[in-house]
Amino acid sequence: MWRGRDVISARDFNRVDLEELFEMAKYMEKYAKSRVEFLKGKIMAVAFFEPSTRTRLSFEVAMKRLGGDVIGFWGAEGTSVEKGETLADTIRMLDAYSDIIVIRHKYEGAAKLAAEVAESPVINAGDGAYNHPTQAMLDVYTIWREFGTVDGLNIGLLGDLRHARTINSLLEILTNFKVRVYLISPELLRPRVETINYIQSRGLMLSFHTNIEEVIHELDVVYVVRIQKERFIDPLEYERIKGSYKITLDTLKNVKKNLIILHPLPRVDEIDHRVDSTPYAKYFRQAAFGVPLRMALLYLILQP
């Protein structure tokens, strides 16, 4: 089911795929701080044209924990890309040297192009402002590990839901489960119409809100993304909106006792640091799950 597959869009995976991935990730948790030889002799090429900390490092650690090796680059500096080499030619070279390619790029569609060119499987580690499928898989895996299920939960997405690529992929993944999603953002920062139309066509229950205080008592999960300052022409408008989409201790006064707060990280100031010490804060555990989740992904794709 997974062997040899590309991971380009969250839309390409169904519930059976995800449940198989989650079970394998849970199995891989016991190896996340050790080394096994499941992928001994395999080489992963990383092509990160954009900055990354958690995604890049967790992929590299995952491959090394599985006994494989890593080659590649982080930024175009010092590569033939600086000389004008095309993306397609760069991918062809990496394909010749490796068994799987992990790519991050600022342009939407870059991962799809890479998959069309390469014979080896390609994993999209984020392209443009739209796709980040492995982050969405990690997010939903964290929910699954915390609650033992995803079905039946009320999930709130808070912040800039238009420009955060994690949001698009997360919504697409969630269409495989029986959940209700609360979209909490300024109207101008709601997800793209195309995304909304797709997830509604898949039967996902949606509601739109502009105030977290009005709905947080109903939520089982709050998934926070930052309000992106660079999207605002008027800095005063940014300051006004930013403060309305922040999680503080006061925000958490009347929440469910088993509420969890997630964030793809890095954060700026959208979650008060005092929230870190509450039982609701699960974003660091979420980040830690990145290694076993990506170990599972690599193993399932490259398994003998």
UniProtKB/Swiss-Prot annotation:
State what protein this is by name: Aspartate carbamoyltransferase catalytic subunit
Family annotation (InterPro entries)? Asp/Orn_carbamoyltranf_P-bd (IPR006132), Asp/Orn_carbamoylTrfase (IPR006130), Asp/Orn_carbamoylTrfase_sf (IPR036901), Asp_carbamoyltransf (IPR002082), Asp_carbamoyltransf_Asp/Orn-bd (IPR006131)
Q: What is the lineage of its organism?
A: Archaea, Thermoproteota, Thermoprotei, Thermoproteales, Thermoproteaceae
Pathway field of the UniProt record reads: Pyrimidine metabolism; UMP biosynthesis via de novo pathway; (S)-dihydroorotate from bicarbonate: step 2/3
| Residue numbers binding L-aspartate | K83, R165, R226
Q: Which PROSITE patterns match?
A: CARBAMOYLTRANSFERASE
Please give the organism: Pyrobaculum islandicum (strain DSM 4184 / JCM 9189 / GEO3)
Enzyme class, broadest EC rank: transferase
- List the catalytic activities from the record: carbamoyl phosphate + L-aspartate = N-carbamoyl-L-aspartate + phosphate + H(+)
PANTHER family xrefs: ASPARTATE CARBAMOYLTRANSFERASE, ORNITHINE CARBAMOYLTRANSFERASE, MITOCHONDRIAL
What Gene Ontology terms describe what this protein does at the molecular function level? amino acid binding; aspartate carbamoyltransferase activity
| Biological processes annotated in GO | 'de novo' pyrimidine nucleobase biosynthetic process; 'de novo' UMP biosynthetic process; amino acid metabolic process
